[in-house]
């Protein structure tokens, strides 16, 4: 099992950055893992697989908080949260996320 997860990690295009970021408009959504392609959101009320979501949050970058706005879809739903794949995002937000992950990883 550990070998399988290492293999999955090595195939990822981006590392997952563990971080606590609150999602605007959703009181109990907290981003736990984040990269430019998606995130894992901790919540007591995860949405079902294939549900579409609109996300707005901020990331600390270059001594300020920068906004991120993205559309996504739930790819995995678990009792403690859900994995989101970003499906639509302006290029500038994608660039912010790439830089954010590079800074902290």
Question: Positions of the model-derived regions?
Answer:
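N-terminal helix initiation/capping motif
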Residues: 1-36, 44, 102-105
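C-terminal output/interaction extensions
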Residues: 2-4, 13, 81-105
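Short coil-to-beta-strand transition motifs
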Residues: 24-26, 64-70
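Conserved hydrophobic positions within beta-strands
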Residues: 31, 72-74
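Short, conserved beta-turn/loop elements at beta-strand boundaries and strand-helix junctions
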Residues: 36, 77-82
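Short, surface-exposed secondary-structure edge patches
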Residues: 42-48
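Loop/turn positions that initiate beta-strands
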Residues: 50-52
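Short, charged beta-turn/beta-strand-edge "cap" motif at the junction between a beta-strand
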Residues: 59-63
């Amino acid at each position: 099992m550990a070998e399988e997860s290492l293999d999955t990690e090595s195939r990822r295009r981006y590392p997952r950055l563990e971080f606590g970021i609150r999602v605007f408009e959703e009181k109990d959504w907290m981003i736990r893992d984040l990269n430019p392609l998606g995130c894992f959101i901790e919540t007591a009320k995860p949405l079902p697989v294939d549900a579409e979501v609109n996300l707005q949050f901020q990331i600390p970058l270059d001594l300020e908080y920068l906004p991120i706005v993205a559309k996504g879809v739930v790819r995995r739903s678990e009792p403690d949260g859900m994995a989101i794949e970003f499906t639509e995002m302006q290029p500038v937000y994608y660039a912010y996320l790439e830089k954010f992950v590079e800074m902290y990883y």
